Amino acid sequence: MAEQGRGQRGSGYGLGLSTRTQVTGYQFLARRTAMALTRWRVRMEIEPGRRQTLAVVASVSAALVICLGSLLWSFISPSGQINDSPIIADRDSGALYVRVGDRLYPALNLASARLITGRASNPHLVRGSQIDSMPHGPLVGIPGAPSDFNPASPATSSWLVCDTVAGPSTMPQSPHGVTVTVIDGTPDLTGHRRVLKGSDAVVLRYGGDAWVIREGRRSRIDATDRSVLLPLGLTPEQVTQARPMSHALYDALPVGPELVVPEVPDDGAAATFPGAPGPVGTVIVTPQISGPQQYSLVLTDGVQTLPPLVAQILQNAGRPGNTKPVTVQPSSLAKMPVVNRLDLSAYPDDPLNVMDIRDNPSTCWWWERTAGENRSRVQVISGPNIPVAPHEMNKVVDLVKADMSGREADQVYFGPNFANFVAVTGNNPAAQTTESLWWLTEAGARFGVEDTKEAREALGLGLTPSPAPWVVLRLLPQGPTLSRADALVEHDTLPMDMSPAELVVPK
């Protein structure tokens, strides 16, 4: 029976191995016994073994994080080994050095260091002890050259020359009452600023002449010629009391035809075409069934269409034998030959809408060209102040060498979409040629750039330069030329600036 019982137990429990529940129970009893012997308590609230395991895992994890962080920081900010770095800077003092052969030379600026090495490298930061371990040479480079190179060449190049006439709301910056501001970038046209269109105009004076500024150009006008003033909606006082214009704005604005009584060739002579209603110089008026009357002028070999305002000017001039227009029916006018001999583009279609300079003391000449276009756009902006956003006004830089004569810029501002690597182009809207290359700093200085592949690559100026009219660039103070020959120069001392300005330190 006992043997039979053992057989039954063997068939029911297999080999009699321990189950998982028995093993975990045994381990629990062992840990409880160890805790009873070591801590004199059997409540399993804290297990020392598990705490030790967690401590080891946490320590290993922290060590790995520290090692990975150190590795990453070594790439971001290396410890500073000179090795073969061509341009070196002292990590503590920031002093700049250029490496030529086995000798370090103190460099005046980054432009000089790049031109000497021929590479557009940034300074490699090292410890001063490493710099002291190498032989040194004298000071090298171009005095006054820039150290900041972040070239920008937008698709649309935009430049402005602005005059701000001193008044109750503007502080006079110039003894002549005009502040000249150069703006590189897109103007801000909010805040009652407007682009002059149609009959909009500004009347300013330069020297002894008065000028009507509209449609991107200036036209001279005589304050004593009432036959022209009245149709234009101007008074002699508006012209004689016009506020001054700077030489910079005067040069930037292309000159247009003078606003005078149009000079008619062979005035008073007999017209040579059949059916002429009168001699040369006769003003013709043609009634229309719908719309305003049409005016024309009899010339030697035909008739030229006149704007009503020009017809009024000719009538005001009181030419002999032509005191009033001659009425010609449309059917008769249609048989007369049409010519276009007189340039009447300076005259508006309607009386001028003159901007009040007291409310709009700022006048800007705006030059703009987009890449791929054959012509530039020239417009005039008028407003209460220069076209700079209010929150950007603190970025307008007052130039140290502002001459306050209106021949150079007094202020400069780099606005949105500014260009700092430019090629000079002509002032003519159709100009396609590009000449010298220039690098501009946000302090308002311009530096000529040697037009060679080596110099441009060394300075990191590989992009295509934006066009910029010379009439604007010449208003900025000029710095030295950035060339390799000028950079390969040693100095014991540097010349002193003979016309510095005092730095005012707030108390």
Swiss-Prot record:
GO terms for cellular component: extracellular region; plasma membrane. Its EC number is 3.6.-.-. It is found in: Cell inner membrane. InterPro entries: T7SS_EccB (IPR007795), T7SS_EccB_R1 (IPR044857), T7SS_EccB_R3 (IPR042485). One of its GO terms (molecular function) is ATP binding. It holds the Pfam family T7SS_ESX1_EccB. Keywords: ATP-binding, Cell inner membrane, Cell membrane, Hydrolase, Membrane, Nucleotide-binding, Transmembrane, Transmembrane helix, Transport. The chain crosses the membrane at residues 56-76. The keyword Nucleus does not apply. It is a single-pass membrane protein. Belongs to the EccB family. PANTHER family: ESX-2 SECRETION SYSTEM ATPASE ECCB2. Part of the ESX-5 / type VII secretion system (T7SS), which is composed of cytosolic and membrane components. The ESX-5 membrane complex is composed of EccB5, EccC5, EccD5 and EccE5. An ATPase. Part of the ESX-5 specialized secretion system, which is responsible for the secretion of EsxN and a number of PE_PGRS and PPE proteins. This is ESX-5 secretion system ATPase EccB5. The gene is eccB5.
